[in-house]
Amino acid sequence: MKNVLSLLILFSFITTTAEVKNQFATLPDIYSVKISPDGKSIGILRKIDGERMLSILDIQTNEVIFNHEFVRGDEINSFYWASEDRLIFELLRAGRDTTRYFATGQVYSTDIDGKKQIMLAGYNAKREAVRTGQGSAKRPAQVANMMPYDKEHIVVQFYDSSEFFELWKMNIYNGRMSKITTAPVKQANFIFNNQGEVTGAVGMTLQNEMVYYIYKENLPIEYDPLDC
């Protein structure tokens, strides 16, 4: 709590959102600083008392809206603003020596005040997010695209042993999801446009050659390779 109060003291001297971001970024143990889409709130992910905590503050009033942290070993790896009042987290966990961390493949969503929480993906996915159609949310995943013009959905990339990654569109409030596509090549990197729509993929062939694929929705063969 003492460390949180020290944040507020510094915060009271800052007048603009640009200054807010720059000032907090110079503090020790800061992992990430992001301002909300409406510019009214700021999220500061930092280590406090040995734990990674995300503090959401009101820029105008200097008040802490909520401190987000996890128990039982999980910690916040990264966070995203889905809207001015909704957050997305990717989680990690410390190794046995507590000096190394590894991603758990869990994707979590909550309001900025800690309400309406749901584990969207990973081994702790909630029941309503577990199965829709032919896909299970109880798989390792990460955020692939935040879909900036859609405040209720994100694109999640799921992993499995086949290494042909899958993209799913997921509702950040109830976990319902619909499949977008499967990668045309192992360990592909997907490409998106400004609207958050997948437009292609990049990957390596068995002959160790880089191949670019153009995504064509609703066709029997969804990808066309480009000669490079």
Residue ranges and their predicted role:
Residues 4-14:
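Sec-dependent N-terminal signal peptides
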Residues 18-228:
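Beta-propeller folds
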